[in-house]
Amino acid sequence: VTLIKPTRIKQSKGALDAVLHGRVVAVDPASGAASNPGYCVMQSGVIQEYGILRVPRAKTINLRLKAIHETIRDELPEADLLVIEDIPAFFLQKFPHSCKPLLFSCGVIMAAKPWPFVLPIQPSVWYSIVDKIIPGKRANYNKQDEHDALMLAVTAYTLAANQPKVKTENLLLPQGLDIGRLVK
């Protein structure tokens, strides 16, 4: 596994090719008993599918993480690149009880398949893309786990496809993106 920083995606030919011409799987992690991971599959810059992975409920975090691992392993396709939410360190300090299981979930997702590249993207980065494509910006974003996973994939594509900088005008977005579904 090669971890790629979002700011370095254009310098990594393998990761850049994976995003623009290969299969990308994006996962919005979940760890709580009531939440499920969102996912998005994108092939050569075209959104193929996105939704929620139904993970069986479990009594302990260990069993929940095992169920997340098995669900990712069994239900998601192999991919050239995994995009996952990068949980900022200050979240861990501010919300330790909810953030630790979320970080564990990220590790379990990364270990579930032999992803050649992993692109962790912080929420502030993909929210900046939300602000560029959603009318009314983040206030009108319909925040759901599957939409968050979709935005992770859209952000990976946007960072890779837009040279040299991501600008609102003439923004290249993946095909098959229905922005209307992301609006409240």
Language-model features: where?
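Phosphate- and other anionic-substrate recognition elements at nucleic-acid/protein interfaces
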Residues: 1-184
